[in-house]
Amino acid sequence: MKVFISYGAAADQVTALRLQALGAVNGLTVYVPPAHTRQGLGVLLDSESSQKLSEAEVVLGVVGTGLAEACRQELNTAMGLGKNMIIMSYPAFAYQLQQYFANLVVVDPANPGEAETGIVGYLKAIDAQQNAKKALLALGTLALGLLLFASVDRD
């Protein structure tokens, strides 16, 4: 299964790369756009990211420290392509994302169980193959753990 991980800002790349490694050891082909795509206000997606996004069966959005224009474009493109998506965000960025993504899961470090419930609820609602649901659940759970660990590291 091919997964595209769109991350909010350059600082979120660490979480995305950890998810990529965890996905790879579980048999997933995971693409994470390079950090240079999060610098500046690029107008278009780079060609490699665009191709990988088109090939992906699942798109996971990780917005922990900010929302770069490249991430916004990737997520909008994924929506336009009808990709199975799940977007995870800290509460600070939820207001920016809620109006665009019905499948937003807000990760509150004080109440991680609520985010897990949101992920499971979303996965039950989408009409996707069983493998895609399992992959999304696994990646969502891993992302939740990594985001929580990242918040502990900052404290």
Enumerate the language-model features and the residues they cover.
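Long, low-complexity, intrinsically disordered polar/charged segments
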Residues: 1-13, 49-68, 113-127, 131
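Conserved N-terminal substructure of TIR/SEFIR domains
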Residues: 1-58, 141-155
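Short secondary-structure transition/capping segments
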Residues: 2-9, 75-87, 133-143
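C-terminal interaction surface of TIR/SEFIR-family domains
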Residues: 13, 92-155
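Short, glycine/charged-enriched secondary-structure capping and boundary segments
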Residues: 18-21, 73-77, 100-103
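Short, structured coil segments at secondary-structure junctions
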Residues: 26, 81, 99-103
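Structural signal for conserved beta-strand scaffold positions within catalytic alpha/beta enzyme cores
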Residues: 32, 87, 106-108
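Conserved beta-strand-loop-alpha-helix hinge of the TIR/SEFIR fold
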Residues: 50-94
